């Protein structure tokens, strides 16, 4: 549960890594609301360990993005929203090892998995434009666990692999009960934006989202906004010196959580729920 985690007040690259915060929050949560400017699915790949447990445990994610995506991400989102998914074995979602491998690689299977998760509303996207003519540039979010406990954050990091593993980024974290008022503010901000009830953002169809090859945006600016989705796990040009791994404490915690019983995806039968509750009480 989120209340059992001693989150730090802030996380900064090179010290307490933002990636460490996101991973630990994901494995303790059942819902993740993310208010963004720029989204890249490479952020999911960077957090593959956390996302695999989050999804396998029934987690649901809602994401508010601006009107620029990579070509591959836009296609994956459109395919999911239109239920255009072929040859994806949904049972992989309850196999944590296979799911982690799927989410960590930039390949066709990853994007099919992303599309499938979108098609069954496990990950939802809403695209927005600013009413002021600029770019949506919010960077905040709220995690919620199955008991309703919440943790919020705000900071400099876009949701991408570059931001989580290479850039210098800082985020501030708000936890219960000391920061309940601030958490409620961010939850309200997200919910209003999601319902299209805010004066500074307007919803647009994903079809209208621009891709990084759009000529209206300078190449240099786009490269700054959206990373090139380099697979840092397999690219030897990136030294481990620059990419700080997850702490051993968190890796040990992930390993323990992988052993917890969970319901086969996607249905949860009453007999399984009773067996699970009996196991927990022993």
Predicted regions and their residues:
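Phosphate-binding P-loop
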Residues: 278-282
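PLD/PLD-like phosphodiesterase catalytic module centered on the HKD motif
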Residues: 1-277
